[in-house]
A protein has these predicted regions:
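A generic structural motif
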Residues: 73, 121-122, 135, 244-246
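...with weaker cross-activation on analogous glycine-rich loops/strands in unrelated enzymes
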Residues: 78-153
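Beta-loop motif signature
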Residues: 191-246
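Tryptophan-centric aromatic hotspots in well-structured domains and transmembrane helices
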Residues: 63-66, 70, 123, 239, ...
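Short capping motifs at secondary-structure boundaries
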Residues: 17, 72-81, 235-238
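N-terminal capping segments
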Residues: 1-75
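Short, polar loop/linker segments at the starts of domains and inter-domain junctions
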Residues: 22-47, 156-164, 210-227
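Aromatic- and glycine-rich peptidoglycan recognition patches
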Residues: 2-9, 107-108, 125-205, 219-220
Length: 247
């Protein structure tokens, strides 16, 4: 299952991408080639190619929000990505103000950040102007990866690149944070704490997997972990392994 960690890793891999001066697919997938300021990107192309993701074609338009949407679709798949973004098919989600409203409608808009949030910025008139992905936060700063921006500490709403940035939490340009409704598994948390069990491998016609024992050498629990089940190995002693299993 994809997680916030995967989402952030994908975003970090895209840092340095430059928008293109033409829509020529020969260059869309090269980070640096054919750079220009006409807002053509692989992100908009791929979402446009889905046919009904947005209410119209978006390549050639401002793409900060398109970049965030692309990250979610690429990481979690289209269906789950749209659920996390609170966006229907043929949505207006390429617009920053509309994306904010999608979160607000679900009660998912907050004043303090968490990893995996979508950050929203406003201009001096209070209008939404820019957005990005939160990849970390501490007591002083929020750290972001943004599309259609440039380096530096100020908010750049149409800068032409994917950049890693940071802002003080008190920055008045920050309007708020949209928080996708991640499952515990998607946050990377264990669904339940590890239950410590003892196991050994038994081969033969009756078992093809790991038989669970509560103590080393004790009677089995009539539970079987099928081959391929992932466990956390804490200790190995002879033929016994002490493992944690998410149950």
């Amino acid at each position: 299952m994809a997680t916030i960690k995967d989402l952030i890793q994908l975003a970090q891999n895209e840092v340095g991408y430059l928008e293109k001066k033409t829509a020529d697919t020969k260059y869309l997938y090269d980070k640096k080639a054919n750079a220009g300021y006409n807002n053509y990107t692989k992100y908009a192309k791929e979402l446009d190619d889905l046919g009904d993701f947005y209410n119209g074609k978006k390549n050639g338009y401002h793409w900060c929000d398109v970049f965030v949407d692309w990250l979610f679709v690429k990481t979690f798949g289209r269906k789950r990505g749209q659920e996390l973004l609170n966006q229907p098919n043929k949505s207006t989600g390429a617009g920053v103000g509309f994306s904010k409203k999608f979160y607000q409608a679900e009660g998912r808009y907050y004043s303090s950040p968490e990893k995996g949030d979508q950050i929203f910025f406003r201009n001096s008139s209070g209008q939404m102007q820019h957005t990005g992905l939160v990849y970390d936060t501490d007591k002083t700063y929020v750290y972001t990866i943004e599309g259609n921006t440039s380096g530096g500490s100020s908010v750049i709403a149409n800068g032409g690149a994917v950049c890693s940035k940071k802002y003080k939490l008190t920055n008045t340009s920050i309007d708020g944070y949209g928080r996708p409704k991640y499952t515990k598994a998607e946050t990377g948390e264990n669904v339940n704490p590890d239950k410590v069990l003892y196991t050994r491998y038994v081969s033969g016609v009756d078992y093809e997997g790991l038989v669970i024992h509560n103590t080393p050498g004790g009677p089995d629990t009539d539970k079987l972990l099928q081959v391929g089940t992932k466990v956390n190995v804490y200790q190995i002693s002879g033929s016994w392994s002490r493992v944690g299993i998410n149950q």
